[in-house]
Amino acid sequence: MLQLSLILESFEIKNKLHFEPISQDETFNLIDKYGFTILDGIDRLKEIPDFYTTNHYKIMVGDVFAGIIGFNNYYDTWKDDPYMAPEPGLGKHSLWIQMLEIRKEAREKIGSPLAIIKGVFDYLCDYCKENGFKSILCGAKTERIATMYRHIGFIGKKDSMFYLIK
């Protein structure tokens, strides 16, 4: 169960939140400039083909640059293995989050990282409802991130893949 203080803090963040579209080059520049670790250990030219088909955004909370996010508006998640879907048909219209990272400085200015991430996912839940998506899917690079996702309502399905059912 989520703490009331976390719910209230994330609600306040969500109300100030907006995404600003950025190009792939701008995304790489921000990753380098702010020391984001999302692509650590990955050969940018060979190992991230999904990066080039993903929409990227700056996460803004008011006028504070909070982080970056990349997602696809449509992703047929379990097309190769429909038995992996948590519910029949769930993978047909899912929002796939390819990358998400919150700036350390934003945590100091805005609030706890968990509240910021929950605010981002609450914002995306509204987006999904408006656009007919059935779930949000994302991967967790580390167990620490996986634990944060579990705290805000994501369910682990396999390995480091998580889903949030709408």
Provide a role label for each language-model segment.
Residues 46-58, 67, 74-78:
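A short helix-loop-beta-strand connector motif used in the catalytic cores of GNAT acetyltransferases and
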Residues 136-147, 165:
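Conserved beta-strand-loop-alpha-helix junction that forms the acyl-donor binding cleft
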Residues 155-166:
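Conserved catalytic-core motifs of GNAT/GCN5-like acyltransferases
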Residues 108-126:
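Conserved acetyl-CoA-binding loop-helix of GNAT-fold acetyltransferases
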Residues 2-47:
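Short amphipathic alpha-helix that is part of the acyltransferase structural core
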Residues 54, 130-133:
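Short, high-confidence coil segments that cap the C-terminus of an alpha-helix
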Residues 148-154:
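Conserved active-site tyrosine of GNAT-family acetyltransferases
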Residues 65-103, 108-111:
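Conserved acyl-donor/pantetheine-binding loop and adjacent beta-alpha core of acyl/acetyltransferases
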